[in-house]
């Protein structure tokens, strides 16, 4: 079958599947039991609205599914004055409706309860659009990428999650499944070839590194694995209290989530390097093993910084509201969530640790993959009849490399290492003696009257352990305060250890650093003080330092610039983006401006001003713009409020509505898209430059073809990067949904309705929009890079 016929056939199949699922969804109805009460969940559409009432709406719904299909019913859409729960309906809106049945043979509708918006069809249309674009752009490779996603989903939902639910060792299971997914993805996308071998070996090496570091991290920071929320539900605590989850090892499940969250990024790096080395060998058989290894390192150094951004921005985008909390002064209680408290909170610390060790793992994937891919080129068979005759020889390629190396500074790497080590030591000393004011009260003359603050303290000794029961232990601790206005003073604090609720327990031992909440007058400490959190930021700083050192050692000069660019990106976010958003400026506009600054910093500064970097910057902004348009248009159909979580509700209840939460949600999605767009663009443009260097006689169209070869090779693995990043973060949620007894007790809703819940639909949209932007970035980058090289 020719390529265009294959594309046509694939598009027809996708459209047929979308149409079938669309019809099936519109007929959805399911019986749900609430105790002895039988109800039917079905679909209804708003046909008429009565807005005469100022306090609520009277909506007339037509039932679209179930045995009541075609009937109409009036529903009072009650507003209670809370923006995070009230919703304004419009004619044409479709919602899930719950109809109670007083009798099993009931023919008419007595009462109806409004449930979630019916968001699933629109998400289905976006999924179909993504699949069609992947087929049109990628052809057979696009079809294989779709098949890979489908098979990955089957393995995750029908093998990985059931094994975890049954209580098998999470770390062993996640490593085994990750190895299987890696092998399957590479074989399906690239077939049985040598580049598959190098990619798989490199990915597995990085995964083992992540597994080891995750175990060390969760033990060093006393992570319980229970700090997960789903909307307004404290999911981790709910699962801990549910008998069906008593066999689960939550700490190891946290490590399993970190492994799964990193596997996509490592597959992408491994495939990018393997594909680039293979492509270079195809266009120039004179490339030696040593030169092939060097080419792998060149591509890996170009992409490792942007891949790190992909992981980091994926997590930052989902936590944008949390990042704003330190800038909110709550009435009467002050700054309840200073940065010092948030960074030591388990949920935040676990997310930061996941981003750090994921970055270390993918950086270590670079040397492993490069060495294996280079060695395997020794056994590659190239058809020299298809290669131009006037290509550079091995000696000429070596001379080109020496000329490039002579231009590089020999002192940048050791200087960078010294600066990083000194900075980490200084930062450690600073955080160990840091404090954060919550409330500060002064009299009319400006004299300090009272203060409440978070401050670091060191546990000197345990004075007494008393009132021990089956569920609690009371420790009397002597703690020396290391910071704040009471610095140097010793406190006697009671630390309650709850044996049956580890998330609410701070296991402080003599010598540990803890975060304390203290208060009182300047002359005397008050009586009510407590141990707030375990001091987790110290270990995070050490791991951050290890990450920077590894980046420099592997990336050399490019690694030093990568570190500087990462720090620069962090400064842009902390000192530019967050203050402007907190000041009430439009979040989407601020994020777009910040994205441009970060893309420029990450590409032009790290790699240097060149054709490939400017091509990547232009392509990145095009991808972010397209994805942003998709997100903004989708908001109109999906009716997100941006307040589908407990943090937003707390902010609204305390200070009203200081932000446009809808725009905040969309802005968070754009942040998550940025890393993917940058990474996809630089991987394609970097590989095309290596191909052009190996064979300068290639025409622009041949260069575009090579760029598309690399781009479509990484398409499936880049999609997996986002997919597995979200799976890793939501591993407990997936287990709770798939385990039948848990789903019925925690989520008394059909799966189709769960997919339409605002927080779930937002995560799905984040994934789809990012993937759509990535798919379009590949041809844009290939075309711009090819014709830019031609003009040179």
Where are these regions (language model features)?
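Structural detector for short beta-strands of small beta-barrel domains
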Residues: 35-57, 446-475
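Generic detector of multi-pass transmembrane helix bundles and their immediately adjacent loops
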Residues: 211-344, 628-769
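Extended, hydrophilic extramembrane loops/domains of integral membrane proteins
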Residues: 81-122, 500-539
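Membrane-entry signal-anchor segments at the cytosolic-membrane interface
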Residues: 1-14, 121-127, 140-145, 400-418, ...
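Hydrophobic alpha-helical transmembrane segments of membrane transport and translocation systems
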Residues: 322-410, 423-426, 727, 731-792
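Transmembrane alpha-helical segments that form the functional core of multipass membrane systems
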Residues: 128-132, 138-240, 251-258, 545-552, ...
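Alpha-helical transmembrane segments and their helix-start/interface "positive-inside/aromatic belt" motifs
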Residues: 3-11, 194-207, 303-311, 407-416, ...
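Hydrophobic secretory-pathway targeting helix
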Residues: 1-37, 396-445
